[in-house]
Every structure is written in structure tokens, then in C-alpha cells.
Amino acid sequence: MKAWASTGRGLRINNVWCQQRLLHPLPSRDDTHAIAFSSSPGKSDPEQEGVTGPNKKHSDLATIKQPTSGIRRQDASSSSCFAGRGSSGLEGCRDRRRPLRSYTNISLELAVGGPLTMVPQICHPVKARQPLVVHEWNIFRSIPSTFILTEEGPPRCHRFLGTELSYSSHPEIPIRIPRCRIRDAPLPHSPRITLHGHRNSGVPQRSAARSPAGTNGFIIPPWNHYMYEPECRLTRLCGQAPHSRVPPCGACAPNTTRSTRGVAGHIAKGLSRIVEPPLWIVILPPKRILPLPKGEPSIHYARCVNHFMIASKAATSAEKWKHHHPRFRRYHPSARARSGFMDQSFEDCSASLCYVSGTRPEIRKVRARMVGDPLLTGTPSEELLAATPTTHSIGLSAEDKYRSTAGRPTSRSARTILPRDDDVSNRSYRISASIHYCGECSKERNGLYRMQHIPRSSCAKTPARKHGGTIRVARDEYGPGVFRAPPPTPAEGRALLLIGVRRQGRTNWYSDMTRVDCVANHLRRERAPHTRCR
């Protein structure tokens, strides 16, 4: 198994970790399994537990027992191997006395010039990626716990790197959905660029010699065979940002475009203001995954403590993100957009707790913003021609008999023909999720007109009738002036369905709705004359 961790020799942990739990609970059992790459897949191994014949044949993965408590303790005596300088800490970590897959702790001090953290690396042979529907990966129950370990931080670990996963080894359904649309796109679960600021971390002087002068933080990229351009090039481009440089083990590619360099520079500069004090120790990904094919969509992902930012450019990328977001939130309801996040200075982007994507048609800038922080950056980029589709949402409502194919609501009798109350709630949930297809950053007035009738969230002959009557868009009841009102502040706790910001004679539309009943409550409050937006 390729999994690396610091030895912790002479290391005092005085800082307090800002932890961000993922959406999976940590397994209570102590005999959690760790997934590893088997160097001899054809041989029978008693340690390969839970891997059946077909899966074992096609995946070349082995399951090795590793107690969770042992990973958390990270005993220094269990580290018995050092990575060589010539391999940049990625290869050459095998002890002749023990097989490669038996390792769980390997120090990278010699490779990067300082103590690092645990890096679970789940490898897969470089082959043509097989469809996920071929195999069911339910036997790999420990992959979510691996992410949690890297997030929470064992008490003896100092810093944390990313995680390498093959395309076909991730068992989570919510991750399969976006990967069908964006191949191995980064998410809060997946490999990420992780930034942590530590005070009194006790970094040795030799580590500071390899990093920018006067800095004491770090930025580490993930290693993933299927990363897109920003994930694998951002670290090299950080050398163009102020007060940062690339270590001697690599250099910036000569054919790197100026726009990508600017994006990386702005991200590095902006995050350095948040992480105090700033530091950029850059570790390069393997050269064998660079460069990536030209013309691939670009998704910029950055993270700082509990702040996430995903900025996407190119029409196909932005379009796919908008299709993915409601599905992601359906499986992870806790990752909801913050109400009232949009403001006039950020009208060119669509933002939520999970992603930031520029989607204004014919836009010449990609604007990125950290969630919960006033940071706003911009850099020249490609054109974004991402118009929000409405046909799919209207089609879903038509299938459920809530409206016609033209977008008009159906009669009450048609809406009340439902066999069970569960069908009512399920269909209402599907509709609230499908509204994101139409409302999220919709710029076309015709599309908004077709979505003016928000379907009833209740039916006359079911207990769900208590939610109220038919909800229509605010324009029908309050006129077009409501769309030019400024978004509410988070303290007000209101949920707007559609937000429009006027700029240079053009209105940009946004949606910040998570549930239909939230919009209904907001509309009820807006019925009062003194609260009506003008």
C-alpha cells in the first residue's frame, strides 16, 4: 500500500486544527479496512478480504486490515521508510524486508525538506477507464473513512496532503453522478488543494530554505491521474503569484497560457490573505500526468479551512456544473447554499457553499470568491456561453402532471391524482431540485416567463395541503420591481426564489432557493405593504 505519514520525531503540536467534517460518519468499528494497490493481483493472498473473483481480476485492488485507532495514533516507531529525493517522494519507498502493500507510514522529510502528513494513496494501474456500472464497489466500505481521517487530523500528525484515487475505486453515488458529466471533477470529497495555516508549528529551518522567504504555511496539490488542468498546474503557476516561488524540483511549463497563470496567481494571493501567516510550499505532481490534452474544460478548486471555492470556465464545464449541483445537494442536504449570498459586486458568478462558477454569456472574466469571505478576484479568461436550460425542468414537471409541456400549470384535479402521500413529497422534492436547472443564473427572459408558475407543493386531497396554495413567481404578484431589489443579508434569514441585478441595461438572474416552503414563507412575508420590494 502506498500511504505516507510523518514520523513526528521531535515535533510538538501546539496549533489547533480547524476541522471540517465530511458528509460521512466515521465507522465505529476499530477494524476499518484500508484499500491498497496489490503488486501481484494474480496471486492468492489471505490479506485480500472481501474482494471477489471478478472484482479482484479487473480492479487489481487488495483490502488490508488497518485499525483506525492505529492510524489516529500515528506512532513514530511504526515509520520505517524514507522517500528518496530523486523520486520527489512518489516512488522508491519500498523496504526489502516487507512487501510494498504492507506499509502505512512513510516519511517524506527527505523529499520535501520538512515533516509532512499522512497521504493515503489509492492507486490503480494506468489503463483505459472502465464504466462504473461494470462493478459494484460496496465491498470497499472504508474509502469514506479515509477521507475523514485526512480531514480530522490524527493527533500525532502535523500536516495533511491530498489523496489519490483511481477513477473506478470511489463507491459514493453522489460522486459518480458528476463524474459522468465532468470526468473526475474535484469535489469536497475528492482530492483537493488543501491549505492550512498553522501557528507555532515548529517547521525546521531546512524546510524554510525550500519555501519562500519569511513564510510558514503551505499549499499541497493532490495527485490524481485524471485531474484537470488547474488541479495539476496550479502549483507550478503559483510561482507567478506575489511572494511565492516554485521549489527547485520543477519549473513552470513554457507553454502555459497567461490566463491560467493569472487565475492561479489570484487564487494564491487571495488565499494568502486568509491563511495567517501565509506560506506556500509547493510540491509538484508527477510529470507523467502533465501536460493534459488541450481543449479540456478547466475547473479551479481551492480550499482554506472550511471555505471552498470551485471556479469553472469554458462553456461545457459551466453547463455541467449547473446540472450537477441539484443532484449533489439531493444526496447531501447539509451542503446547501447560504441564503442571500449574492450581491451586486458578485453578479457575474453563481455561488453556493460548494462551488463558484462564472456563467454570464459572453463574459470575458472569471470571478472567484471564497464562501463567507469578501475576497473577489478576476482574471481574463475564455468566453463563457452557458445559458441555463429550462426544457428539462419543465419536462419533469410535465411527467408529474404538475404542468403542461408549455410550462403552464395543470388543473387541480390532475394534480390531486396521486396514490400515496409519499408520492406527493417525493414529487415536490424533485420539482424543488429541478427548479435549479431553470432558476440558477438564468439570463433569458423567455426562460423566466416559462418558469413563472412554480408548481404546487401540496395537493388538495393529502395532508400536505397544510403547506398552502399554489406558489407563483414574485413577478406575477409584485411586478418586475421585485427582481431589482438587493438580495437580503444572511442575518435576515430570507430565501429568495429569483434575484435580478441591473447593470448597464441588462439584468442578471440568480436563484437562491433550497426548498419550496421557504419561498412560500418569504412570499407570505412580502405580502405586507411595508416589506414589498420596489
Swiss-Prot record:
Entry superkingdom: Eukaryota
Entry's localization field: Plastid, Chloroplast
Main localization (coarse): plastid
Chain spans, region Disordered: 29-95
InterPro entries linked: Maturase_MatK (IPR002866), Maturase_MatK_N (IPR024942)
Gene Ontology cellular component annotations, sorted alphabetically: chloroplast
UniProt feature coiled coil, ranges: none
Keyword list, A-Z: Chloroplast, mRNA processing, Plastid, RNA-binding, tRNA processing
GO biological process: mRNA processing; tRNA processing
GO MF term set: RNA binding
Segments traversing the membrane: none
Function: Usually encoded in the trnK tRNA gene intron. Probably assists in splicing its own and other chloroplast group II introns.
Sequence similarity: Belongs to the intron maturase 2 family. MatK subfamily.
Name used for this protein in its record: Probable maturase K
Organism, scientific name: Selaginella uncinata
